[in-house]
Curated annotation (Swiss-Prot):
A Gene Ontology biological process term: DNA-templated transcription
Known role: DNA-dependent RNA polymerase catalyzes the transcription of DNA into RNA using the four ribonucleoside triphosphates as substrates.
Residue numbers spanned by region Alpha N-terminal domain (alpha-NTD): 1-231
Catalytic function, reaction form: RNA(n) + a ribonucleoside 5'-triphosphate = RNA(n+1) + diphosphate
Protein name per UniProt: DNA-directed RNA polymerase subunit alpha
GO cellular component labels: cytoplasm; DNA-directed RNA polymerase complex
Subunit structure: Homodimer. The RNAP catalytic core consists of 2 alpha, 1 beta, 1 beta' and 1 omega subunit. When a sigma factor is associated with the core the holoenzyme is formed, which can initiate transcription.
GO MF annotation, one: DNA-directed RNA polymerase activity
Length: 326
């Protein structure tokens, strides 16, 4: 008997190419699942892994990013681009204020950044700037935690933080630099229509490539768990309210104690309830056989004593369940 159960990968091979590169191979998948899971993992790896990046910088003697600094080979734009290439990792906190102070001829690298024991510089040899004799570079760097790519103008800035010389940076928080996947044919026994998924990943060194894939898989599982526990949201059904009707209107016209002549004239026109009566106009009643002006005045006076008049409009009349008299 053929089983309808979906295959799950039984072979997972992790090949470490370098400290920042790895190739992960998984098989077998049912046909089509290689692309489904490969694309989902790739998008999560590129967009949803947390990381740290410089977000603001203040440089002594510099008012804006289009300035130059005496004694430094790079202009400020190039300096900021180099600064964005510094890979950092904060331990036990989500943001930090770092300092860099260097003077004299030489190369300024990420190693010159000072921030404390819980700030790890992943690429300390990364070049930030070159100073000439007599050159000096002093700056404060704010590092924050985030996800994906966040333009500087997308982050709200409070009024007290809008100071002259404060430069806001576009931040690329993702620790993953490159991800690609390939789906190949796989075979299990007599089945040859299966998928083999191969993922190549490169990080910036702040996270291990294998751990990055595990994290992305957990994110995907967490998001899909909502569908696994899918339940319809109960919608409260509010019963339709029947418009309330004055009980007086449900009483028969006999309760008005009209003269026999007037009462008989109304019943001849199928007017059995007070609610029927008040919806008629004077003109309509005067057309009733044997009902003259005297009877009309009598009806108007009796209705007025109960706060009612002729020609009134009633919605939902007659109400459901009203017994027909006659």
């Amino acid at each position: 008997m053929q089983s309808n159960a979906l295959l799950k990968p039984r072979i997972i091979d992790v090949q470490s190419i370098s400290p920042v590169q790895a190739r992960v191979t998984m098989e077998p998948f049912e046909r089509g699942f290689g692309h489904t899971l490969g694309n989902a993992l790739r998008r999560i790896l590129l967009s949803s892994l947390p990381g740290h990046a410089p977000t603001e910088v203040s440089i002594e003697g510099v008012l804006h990013e289009y300035s130059t600094l005496d004694g430094m080979r790079e202009d400020i734009v190039d300096l900021l681009l180099n600064l964005k290439g510094v890979v950092l990792k904060l331990h036990n906190r989500s943001e930090a204020m770092l300092t860099l102070s260097k003077s004299g001829e030489g190369v300024v690298t990420a190693r010159d950044i000072e921030g404390g024991h819980d700030v790890e510089i992943i690429n300390p040899d990364h070049v930030i700037a070159h100073l000439a004799p007599g050159g000096k570079l002093e700056m404060q760097i704010k590092v924050e935690q985030g996800r994906g790519y966040v333009p500087g103008n997308a982050r709200p800035v409070s009024a007290e933080n809008k100071t002259i010389g404060r430069i806001v940076l576009d931040a690329s928080f993702s620790p993953v630099r490159r991800v690609s996947y390939l789906v190949e044919s796989a075979r299990v026994e007599q089945r040859t229509d299966l998928d083999r998924l191969v993922i190549d990943i490169e990080t910036n060194g702040a996270v291990d490539p294998e751990e990055a894939i595990r994290y992305a898989a957990r994110v995907l599982m967490d998001q899909l768990s909502v569908f696994a526990d899918l339940e319809g949201t109960p919608v409260a059904v509010v019963p339709e309210k029947t418009p309330s009707i004055d009980p007086v209107l449900l009483r028969p016209v006999d309760d008005l104690e009209l003269t026999v002549r007037s009462a008989n004239c109304l019943k001849a026109e199928n007017i059995y309830y007070i609610g029927d009566l008040i919806q008629r106009t004077e003109t309509e009643l005067l057309k009733t056989p044997n009902l003259g002006r005297k009877s009309l005045n009598e009806i108007k006076e009796v209705l007025a004593s109960r706060g009612l008049t002729l020609g009134m409009k009633l919605e939902n009349w007659p109400p459901a369940g009203l017994e027909k008299l006659g």
